[in-house]
Amino acid sequence: MKDKELSQRKNDHLDIVLHPERAKQTIRTGFEQWRFEHCALPELALDDIDLSTRLFGRVMKAPLLISSMTGGARRASDINRHLAEAAQTLGLAMGVGSQRVALESEDNWGLTGELRRYAPDIPLLANLGAAQIGSLQGLDYARRAVEMVEADALIIHLNPLQEALQTGGDRDWRGVLAAIKRVVNALSVPVVVKEVGAGLSVPVARQLAEAGVTMLDVAGAGGTSWAAVEGERAASDHARSVAMAFADWGIPTAQALRQIHQAFPSMPLIASGGIRDGIDTAKALAMGASLVGQAAAVLGSATTSTSAVLDHFAVVIEQLRVACFCTGSASLSALREARLARVGDEE
């Protein structure tokens, strides 16, 4: 695919995600089905609650990941700068958008070592699609992607549904697992594997764990539906009808998270996919997530300014802190012991 076509596709994606009413879906994350048991005697000071954690040897001030968003649109440079600057200020992790376009064209789209200079102290994660990893140049792409942004780890994103539905998508996924194994064995940094909104199942998580992947991002259904996005940008009624049938396809985020954590309790997990606020964040952490990611929820702020991104996450962090306070949790480890009950099952 030509650089211009790839760039236009990325711009289309941004425009649609910024206007979610254009990509309608009804599936929800599942977090709305769960409630914390309220603690009326927390016996701690709100300001003393410790939200810090560590990722890939770096200290984070809160367990939040700015999930991968954009890496191939003309707007990407400013968006990624705003995100990186905010992540540095708040002590959050950041995953860059797909680096395919930057690797295959002469334009780096802002995905260079300059991004690391905006955010010298945070965990920064490079990002490539499974289709690129599975190509003949896959290992070279992986190494270059990490070097390009001086990353602490590489994210490999799995998006078979989106690829099957989009014009010019990568539809031959044979050998992807073997390619992931090669990258895991060859890279000097950890490898994280994520879905993009349809969720990871326990059998797939098992395959990835056996391949040596360090961390999984369940990236479940309930947030951005890439099937609906591709349906919105489809060039024909036929393509639109096929895509929109899958608008609610996938494993809801809470379900994917709980199932994988139960099956692999020692596997570090990221919960993303429709995380709305700090209460969803707290629920995800209590269900077994090590980190919680947001993308679409902060994209509008990221197109505006660093200050807007800071304002967005300041709200999320304060919501998380209050959730800890009202469950009597002085730290993230304590929050993971807080009682969650499914709505209707409370005793």
UniProtKB/Swiss-Prot annotation:
Reaction catalysed by this enzyme: isopentenyl diphosphate = dimethylallyl diphosphate
An annotated GO cellular component: cytoplasm
Keywords from the named record: Cytoplasm, Flavoprotein, FMN, Isomerase, Isoprene biosynthesis, Magnesium, Metal-binding, NADP
Taxonomic superkingdom: Bacteria
Residues the entry annotates as binding Mg(2+): 163
EC code: 5.3.3.2
Subcellular locations according to the entry: Cytoplasm
Record keyword Nucleus present: no
Alphabetized GO MF terms: FMN binding; isopentenyl-diphosphate delta-isomerase activity; magnesium ion binding; NADPH binding; oxidoreductase activity
Amino-acid positions noted as binding FMN in the UniProt annotation, renumbered to this chain: 67-70, 98, 127, 194, 224, 274-276, 295-296
GO BP field: isoprenoid biosynthetic process
Principal cellular location given in the protein's record: cytoplasm
Enzyme class, UniProt record, top EC level: isomerase
Transmembrane annotation, as ranges: none
Requisite cofactors: FMN; NADPH; Mg(2+)
NADP in keyword set: yes
InterPro entries: Aldolase_TIM, FMN-dep_DH, IPdP_isomerase
Biological role stated in the UniProt entry: Involved in the biosynthesis of isoprenoids. Catalyzes the 1,3-allylic rearrangement of the homoallylic substrate isopentenyl (IPP) to its allylic isomer, dimethylallyl diphosphate (DMAPP).
Protein family according to the UniProt entry: Belongs to the IPP isomerase type 2 family.
Subunit composition and interactions: Homooctamer. Dimer of tetramers.
Protein name: Isopentenyl-diphosphate delta-isomerase
Protein species of origin: Cronobacter sakazakii (strain ATCC BAA-894)
Lineage: Bacteria, Pseudomonadati, Pseudomonadota, Gammaproteobacteria, Enterobacterales
